[in-house]
Amino acid sequence: MKTGKIIKVSGPLVVAEGMDEANIYDVCKVGEKGLIGEIIEMRGDKASIQVYEETSGIGPGDPVVTTGEPLSVELGPGLIESMFDGIQRPLDAFMEAAKSSFLTRGVSVPSLNREKKWDFKPTAKVGDEVKSGDVIGTVQETPVVEQRIMIPIGIEGKIKEINAGSFTVTETIAIVETEKGDREVQLMQKWPVRKGRPYSAKINPVEPMLTGQRVIDTFFPVAKGGAAAIPGPFGAGKTVTQHQIAKWGDAEIVVYVGCGERGNEMTDVVNEFPELIDPKTGESLMKRTVLIANTSNMPVAAREASIYTGITIAEYFRDMGYAVSIMADSTSRWAEALREMSGRLEEMPGDEGYPAYLGSRLADYYERAGKVECLGNDGRIGSITAIGAVSPPGGDISEPVSQSTLRIVKVFWGLDAQLAYQRHFPTINWLTSYSLYADTIDKWMNGNVAENWGALRLEAMTILQDEAQLQEIVRLVGIDALSEKDRLKLDVAKSIREDYLQQNGFHEIDTYTSLKKQYKMLSLILGYRKEAERALEAGVYLNDILAMEDLKDRIARSKYIHEDDLEKMDQIVVDLKNAIDNLINKGGVANA
């Protein structure tokens, strides 16, 4: 290990000389306390080091020791239910080692527990030919997650020895005989965070990641293996939307990265997730979640690492064949960390002071999402769905981070502060949002939910767009200028907005809606429109139709019908048809 000497300190950036044997992205121990840093630039024998801890008290002349290894994460049993900081230090073990509730500098703790023993059940046997990515056994980490122990990348050969039993993450579970000699395999493996884990092939994502949020699943779906952005001004509900997706999304593993946001938001996750029950497994949501907390009061430089740490952990579970979702809240704070380091490196600034390479760094992150055929001989399919919040100052999405993100992702959930002020949640604006997966997912929905799903979705979306145009006419000349058919359209649009798109995240039934229930709800609202138009054509006055308040109230309350009682909606359809038939038979005398 080569020792250099500090010649300059500028906030989280340290410049050291005598580092000619070091490589870019090597991890260094900086100063007498051995603070963790990473080389981000080399000029001759001078290395610019990004330090992931507070640098006060460090000065020129202090030593810098390079470890010769890139910043890597430990991957193995013990990840699920854990909470790490941006460079994968477990916060509970860190607190015990530091004997403090706050981050103390220079404390070194292993990422995975070295004492805990895990029950390993081999699925391979002595004499089997194995290569990178092959599963050789399993560890039941939580009641929900089974870790599939894989041959590390770069090892290929014949199993010489494999043992069942209880092991710590560093004990040898198998020995593989390779051309270059015997290689030991442990439960744990390391991987550099800035390098994507390899796979056999990338697959086109066609299956939706269901979230139980009606506005997302129906109008702006994201595919398993897709990428989505949630931009919005402060208070519009970015974090709440991400929490809802983390809670109810049908991913098997959730990696939640709190990057530069308030600590209270991570506290909410830690408090809520253990108490919430996953509808699919009946277990606590925490049993499938990995948390990475790099809040706004933690060192800025570690924000940059936290997103890479999160995506590398997600890739590890993807390689086991799991559907993983990663939430990054917020990529804007990560970009601000890039901007700060770029400024300290005295690089030429790009738009609004962000570095010129902002777009490519964002692309590097989002491109690690996707649906893939994993390495190994069993043809496992895994996916990572990346959902990134963007916090543009003042809600202005013309700023560089939002624009760079929108060029990369295929789903845009635009949050609207106006909807938040109206207490309409989720605050996804149906006129500005889009999903480029919608047509592909419509085919899946038509085959798996109902044949006319795509047609219903298109009809509802058209009504909402027509409503925006009709509202302008109403504001100019009043509602009396509209025909009865247009006034009916406004009434149906209001029903779609308030009874379908609006969803109460704190109501035990309304917080999650299955696809079957979504289909029945949308069919009910659009069925009301069809029946009302039939009555108008038969000469019934619109006021008589709008006066059916009891039925309209039942349609509005259909969102609170339990998933086990969906036949009640069929009864509403029958009652609606009978009520319209009665109006037509009576001749519809208006109350005008």
Curated annotation (Swiss-Prot):
The keyword Thylakoid does not apply. GO terms for cellular component: proton-transporting ATP synthase complex. Keywords: ATP synthesis, ATP-binding, Hydrogen ion transport, Ion transport, Nucleotide-binding, Translocase, Transport. ATP binds at residues 232-239. It comes from the Bacteria. InterPro entries: ATP-synt_VA_C (IPR055190), ATP-synth_a_Xtn (IPR031686), ATP_synth_asu-like_sf (IPR023366), ATPase_F1/V1/A1_a/bsu_N (IPR004100), ATPase_F1/V1/A1_a/bsu_N_sf (IPR036121), ATPase_F1/V1/A1_a/bsu_nucl-bd (IPR000194), ATPase_F1/V1_b/a_C (IPR024034), P-loop_NTPase (IPR027417). It catalyses: ATP + H2O + 4 H(+)(in) = ADP + phosphate + 5 H(+)(out). GO terms for molecular function: ATP binding; proton-transporting ATP synthase activity, rotational mechanism; proton-transporting ATPase activity, rotational mechanism. Its EC number is 7.1.2.2. GO terms for biological process: proton motive force-driven plasma membrane ATP synthesis. Gene3D superfamilies: 2.40.30.20, 2.40.50.100, Bovine Mitochondrial F1-atpase, Atp Synthase Beta Chain, Chain D, domain 3, P-loop containing nucleotide triphosphate hydrolases. Pfam families: ATP-synt_ab, ATP-synt_ab_N, ATP-synt_ab_Xtn, ATP-synt_VA_C. Produces ATP from ADP in the presence of a proton gradient across the membrane. The V-type alpha chain is a catalytic subunit. NCBIfam families: PRK04192.1. Belongs to the ATPase alpha/beta chains family. This is V-type ATP synthase alpha chain.
